[in-house]
Every structure is written in structure tokens, then in C-alpha cells.
């Protein structure tokens, strides 16, 4: 009711459906464009049940507003005090219900306006771009162009899998073909981050 946008983390991915108009996706190092753009401008971040790990905060870099404050709703006293936030030791559902009612009673509205739709549109374009990534022997540059010996890694990948599918293109196919209630389970590595994005 107050147009507060919502971002999620890997552990809380299923708490708000990704199609909700105020859900801007995952935030942080493994997050997505939409959430990270808004995180840079947020003056209040409400963390619900989060540990505010380095992945979430991009080592505290992602929240760049000079007056950003944190309200941390958590059952863990240790995590509730992180980032010098205001600690609210409470059950997540009860606290959010009370907060929503208080905001509705006061008539307060978030100031994001059309900015949410704008970053979601940019995110959709970015998602389609990475879904369409095609490996090409001579000119392929990965999204994360690190220190690996690419030619050796690509050669080994092709030998083991007899494939040149990129991880993001496979995720695109899965996202477009699996039923809405399907669940993908991922382990460690780059896959959880790609799934969150």
C-alpha cells in the first residue's frame, strides 16, 4: 500500500513472487541490475531476517546514499545490530504486518514513483541479453572476464560436455519452459548468483 519496493536474497528467494510489481529482484554482489540500482539510492533499508553478508551488501559498497539508515528486523540479536542499524528483535511476519499497518495509517508513500518500473524494464532487457549469449570460438568474452586461461577452460568444457551452451542461456530456457511452480535447486559456485539475477 505504501509502494515500498522489495528485494530478495538467495535464502529468501521465495518470500515474494518475482512477478510482484514491487519486487526488484536480488540485491548485492550476486544480485541484479534493478535492485542494485535502487540500493545505491536507498535512504532506508529494511532488512528482514538477513545477516547482511558481504554478498548482500557487496562488502558494504552497494548502499551509497550518504544518509542511508538500516532497520534490521531479525530474531537474531547479533544480526539485528549489523550495519549500525536500528535493531528490531521480532518475528518477520508480525513486524512487517505492524509496519505495513503503521505506514497505511500515516498515509506515507515511498518516493520511488516510476523509477521502479524504469529499473525493472532495464533489468528485463539485461536478462534477455544474457539469455541470448552464444559462445563463439573466436570472439566470445564471458560476463566475468577474469584471470582464467579461457581457451583451456573452453576446450575442457567442450570435451567434457560436448556442448557450447552458456550457463545463462540454459537458465533462460529453463525459465521460459518450466511451469511457474517449479523449483530449481543449486549448489555453490556461479550458478546460485546467476539464478538470483
What positions do the PLM features span?
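Short, small-residue-biased leader/transition segments that mark boundaries at the very start
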Residues: 1-6
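Short internal beta-strands
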Residues: 7-11, 71-74
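General beta-strand structural signal in soluble alpha/beta enzymes
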Residues: 7-10, 47-48, 88, 184-188
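Short connector loops at secondary-structure junctions
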Residues: 10-24, 89
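Short gly/pro/ser/thr-enriched loop/turn and capping motifs at secondary-structure boundaries
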Residues: 13-18, 53-54, 77-81, 96, ...
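Phosphate/diphosphate-binding loops
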Residues: 28-81, 86
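Acidic-glycine-rich active-site phosphate/pyrophosphate-binding loop
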Residues: 183-197
Amino acid at each position: 500500500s505504501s509502494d515500498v519496493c522489495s528485494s530478495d536474497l538467495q535464502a529468501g528467494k521465495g518470500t515474494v513472487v518475482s512477478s510482484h510489481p514491487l519486487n526488484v529482484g536480488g540485491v548485492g554482489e550476486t544480485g541484479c541490475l534493478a535492485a542494485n540500482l535502487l540500493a545505491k539510492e536507498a535512504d532506508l533499508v529494511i532488512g528482514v531476517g538477513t545477516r547482511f553478508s558481504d554478498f548482500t551488501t557487496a562488502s558494504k559498497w552497494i548502499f551509497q546514499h550518504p544518509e542511508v539508515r538500516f532497520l534490521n528486523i531479525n530474531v537474531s540479536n547479533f544480526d539485528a545490530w549489523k550495519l549500525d542499524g536500528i535493531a528490531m528483535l521480532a518475528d518477520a511476519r508480525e513486524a512487517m504486518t505492524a509496519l505495513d499497518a503503521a505506514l497505511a495509517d500515516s498515509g506515507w508513500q515511498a518516493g520511488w514513483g516510476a523509477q521502479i518500473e524504469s529499473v525493472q524494464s532495464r533489468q528485463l532487457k539485461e536478462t534477455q541479453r544474457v539469455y541470448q549469449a552464444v559462445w563463439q570460438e573466436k570472439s566470445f568474452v564471458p560476463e566475468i572476464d577474469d584471470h582464467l586461461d579461457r581457451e583451456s577452460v573452453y576446450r575442457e568444457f567442450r570435451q567434457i560436455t560436448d556442448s557450447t551452451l552458456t550457463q545463462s542461456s540454459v537458465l533462460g530456457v529453463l525459465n521460459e519452459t518450466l511451469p511457474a511452480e517449479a523449483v530449481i535447486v543449486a549448489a555453490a559456485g556461479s550458478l546460485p548468483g546467476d539464478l538470483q539475477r
